[in-house]
C-alpha cells in the first residue's frame, strides 16, 4: 500500500486534475474490480503514461474488451498509448488509430498467473510498433489508489 507521502504527490506527478478525487485504501482493502463504485488504479499504469481523464479512445478500448482499466497491464497501456502516438505521427496528426487498426496488429492475451489481467501480444513481430519495454515489474500491483466519481472517465 502506498504511504501518505506518495499519495500527496499523485495529483502532481501523474497530472491528475484536482477535480478527480483520489484516496488510499484501508489497511486490509485490495484493488479489486467491481466491488465498489470507485475505481482502483495502479501507480504503474500512470508510470506507463496513462492519464486522466481517460481519452474517449482509451475508454473505448476498455469497453470493447469488457474490462476495467485496471485489468490491462501497465505495459499493455504503454503499447496502446505508444501505438496511438506513433500512428498519429505517421499520419501527419490527421488520423487517430482505431481499435480495428490496433487489433489488426495486436491481440489481447490473458496472463495466466494473474487472474483477470490482460496484456497485448503482437500478431506478428513486424507489426510491433512499440518494442522497447522496461523489464517486467512483477510488483506493480502493490501500489494502488482509488478514484472517486466519474470525472476521470473521458475528456
What is each of the regions a protein language model found here?
Residues 1-155:
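Residue-register detector that marks a fixed positional context within folded domains
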